[in-house]
Each structure stands twice: as C-alpha cells, then as structure tokens.
Amino acid sequence: MLLYRLDIADFRVWVSIGVSEQERHYPQPVLVSLSLFFKEEPKACSTDKVSDSVCYAELVSLIEEVATNNPCALIERLAKVLLEKIEKALAGQVSRIDLRVSKERPPIPDLLSPVSFSISREVP
C-alpha cells in the first residue's frame, strides 16, 4: 500500500499571541508545520501540473493570513483556527491533516526550545 503525504515544516509567521496584553503588544514568531495525507495518489504525481496539486505557496499564504488576522492568547487556539481554515480550503483533496504550532520564543526563563501544540484530524 502506498501512502501520500505533503509536508510543510517550520513556516515562520509573526503573530499577536500571548496571555498578557503586554505579550501580545509586539508580534512574536510562531512556527507552523503541516502534514497533508492523501487517500489516493495525487493527480499531480502523474500530470506534473501545478493546477493538479495542492499549491503550497497558496497554503502558506493562507496560514499567514489566518494567523496574522486572528490574535490569540494561546497556541492551542491558534492551532484550532488554522486547522479549520485549512480543512475548509482543502475540502475533498486530503484525508488527514496534522498541524503543529510552536511558539518559538516563549517568555519563560531558561526555556531554550519552542513550546508546541499539535492537532490532527481525519477529513471525511
């Protein structure tokens, strides 16, 4: 059995995010990673046409638009909002979406790595 997956890893978006108003005052970097799963071989595998593919340039543009226009206190909320918009945009094209949102520089002393929240959804 063949499985098909498109991955976009660590797309940086500057967003208004944070628990306090002070934290949300200046845009902060978050990293968005995404895996799209396909039930069948994507048509673009045979045709080599962008029009038959999931255009990842359009997808990252959507991620940036949604993330920058939806200020959130928590990465959990941002992940849910992004997942819903991506699922709607790709209706009928994918069977599963895995999404991870990472706050690149959380304001916690001595925390040296990003904090992440992941969410996955099977798409009917």
UniProtKB/Swiss-Prot annotation:
What are the cysteine partners in each disulfide bond? Answer: none
What is an example of a GO molecular function annotated in this UniProt entry?
Answer: dihydroneopterin aldolase activity
Which residues are substrate-binding?
Answer: E23, Y56, I75, E76
Active-site residues?
K103 (proton donor/acceptor)
Q: Does the keyword Isomerase apply?
A: no
Against Pfam families, the record matches this protein to:
FolB
The record lists the catalysed reaction(s) as: 7,8-dihydroneopterin = 6-hydroxymethyl-7,8-dihydropterin + glycolaldehyde
Q: What is this protein called?
A: Probable dihydroneopterin aldolase
| Species | Chlamydia trachomatis serovar D (strain ATCC VR-885 / DSM 19411 / UW-3/Cx)
